[in-house]
């Protein structure tokens, strides 16, 4: 289900058709300024000004996470209201794997879909446990994710233990 920036339900094709889409998957408990900055910083990376104007920043909340299943319905409406209050369109999915979300969005958005992630989310992409049901495991999942214009924008973070800034080149992956 997709909600427009005013909180009203919309067809995904209407708001995403032939537009670059920047997707941030979070729980949004609560919506933080860094969430909005992550999307804004990723959008600024577009070369053409006309592409930046056409780009859609999209919050994605999955209800497929079994660990969060107990409280997902109790506060989902509050999170949707908070995202609408900051003017962020929202996609609510039951797709646990990002490659499934990418496939869904590629039906509507062109020329590209960009997933925006912090360093912890980036490292989680390489965790093999969620992909045990795929014959190719994590490699198959990554291959299915990064296809036909789907990319990842990594937002730097600070290591809580050392204070060092973590980037794609310095983050530890499993």
Predicted regions and their residues:
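Nucleotidyltransferase catalytic core that binds NTPs
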Residues: 1-174
């Amino acid at each position: 289900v997709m909600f427009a920036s005013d909180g009203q339900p919309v067809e995904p094709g209407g708001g995403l058709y032939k537009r670059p889409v920047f997707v941030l998957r979070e729980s949004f408990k609560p919506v933080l300024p860094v969430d909005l900055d992550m999307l804004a910083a990723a959008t600024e990376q577009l070369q053409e000004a006309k592409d930046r104007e056409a780009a859609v920043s999209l919050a994605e909340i999955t209800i497929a996470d079994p660990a969060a299943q107990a409280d997902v319905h109790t506060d989902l409406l509050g999170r949707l209201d908070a995202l609408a209050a900051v003017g962020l369109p929202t996609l609510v999915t039951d797709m646990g794997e990002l490659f499934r979300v990418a496939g869904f969005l590629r039906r509507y958005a062109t020329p590209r879909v960009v997933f925006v992630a912090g360093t912890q989310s980036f490292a989680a992409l390489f965790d093999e446990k969620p992909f045990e049901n795929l014959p190719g495991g994590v490699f198959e999942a990554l291959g299915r994710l990064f296809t036909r214009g789907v990319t990842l924008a990594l937002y730097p973070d600070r290591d809580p233990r050392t204070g060092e800034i973590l980037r794609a080149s310095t983050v530890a992956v499993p």
